[in-house]
């Protein structure tokens, strides 16, 4: 059974063999021709010379220290990274994944086998909708998908809360729970799931990207630990419906935060995003 976990790792390994080198890394190694060839594959050939020039200029800058993360012009990007990390975890996604069999038992699935099968179904929805998100990200943009997914999560979590609260729904609770969790997972998979990791790879200047991304990643797993450790206690003390409603409130706050602070990075180069940060433009319009 545990050997099945090696299958996605092998698929990832094989897929990585076909990934091209980063043009920035190639230029840092003075491999200009290879960098140009890769840029010509993914960009308009007419703009390649200009982009090579901009990348070369960026590479000449020295790596930034930890103190630079506190500079006013970088602070908005740091807030976005930590904010999205909090929203991704505090809307309860890993709680649902970790405790899905328990949640289905709460809903009335008495057989452990059926609960596990329902959990597997939720996982399949997650994989399929993540593939859909990959296809849509560069077509619709990050912000529209983020808003759509958060709205879907809010609705799903609210419905789940009512399903556990209203006695007259007890007979239908099983299937409302399955449908609600499937919609919740699907909404997450097209929005917060991939977009958090994509955004933190795009919004930070090259000099401090490693440090800034490490902070966002540590924040993400810290919030994950806190939420996972508190779910069962919260469901016991507040009630199962209140737990889902609390996650819905976090999703509402996340929607407001995303509208005002999360930038649209579709079609923008890393250098253009950094220039917008330095110029002090409204981050929403980066």
Named regions from a protein language model:
Residues 33, 49, 53-57:
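Loop segments that connect adjacent transmembrane helices in multi-pass transporters
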Residues 1-40, 59-286:
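Alpha-helical transmembrane bundle of multi-pass membrane proteins
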Residues 41-51:
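Short intracellular "coupling" helices and adjacent cytoplasmic loop segments at the cytosolic face
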């Amino acid at each position: 059974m545990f050997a099945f976990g090696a299958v996605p790792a092998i698929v990832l390994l094989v897929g990585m063999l076909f990934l091209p080198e980063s043009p920035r890394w190639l230029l840092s190694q003075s491999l200009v021709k290879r960098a140009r060839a890769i840029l010509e594959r993914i960009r308009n050939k007419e703009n390649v010379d200009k982009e090579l020039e901009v990348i070369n200029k960026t590479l000449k800058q020295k790596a930034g220290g930890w103190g630079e993360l506190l500079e006013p012009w970088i602070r908005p990007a740091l807030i976005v990274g930590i904010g999205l990390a909090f929203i991704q975890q505090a809307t309860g996604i890993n709680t649902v994944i970790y405790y899905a069999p328990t949640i289905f038992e709460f809903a009335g699935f008495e057989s452990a086998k059926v609960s596990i099968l329902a959990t597997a179904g939720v996982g399949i929805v997650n994989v399929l909708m993540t593939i859909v998100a990959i296809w849509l990200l560069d077509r619709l943009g990050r912000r529209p998908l983020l808003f759509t997914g958060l709205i879907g999560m809010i609705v799903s979590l609210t419905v789940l809360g009512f399903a556990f609260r209203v006695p007259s729904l007890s007979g239908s609770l099983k299937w409302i729970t399955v449908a609600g969790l499937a919609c919740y997972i699907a909404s997450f998979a097209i929005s917060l799931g991939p977009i958090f990791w994509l955004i933190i790879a795009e919004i930070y200047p090259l000099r401090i990207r490693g440090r800034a991304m490490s902070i966002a990643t540590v924040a993400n797993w810290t919030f994950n630990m806190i939420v996972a450790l508190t779910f069962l206690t919260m469901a016991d003390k507040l009630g199962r419906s209140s737990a889902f409603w609390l996650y819905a409130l976090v999703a509402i706050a996340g929607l407001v935060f995303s509208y005002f602070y999360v930038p649209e990075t579709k079609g923008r180069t890393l250098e253009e995003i950094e220039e917008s940060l330095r110029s002090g433009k409204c981050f929403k319009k980066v």
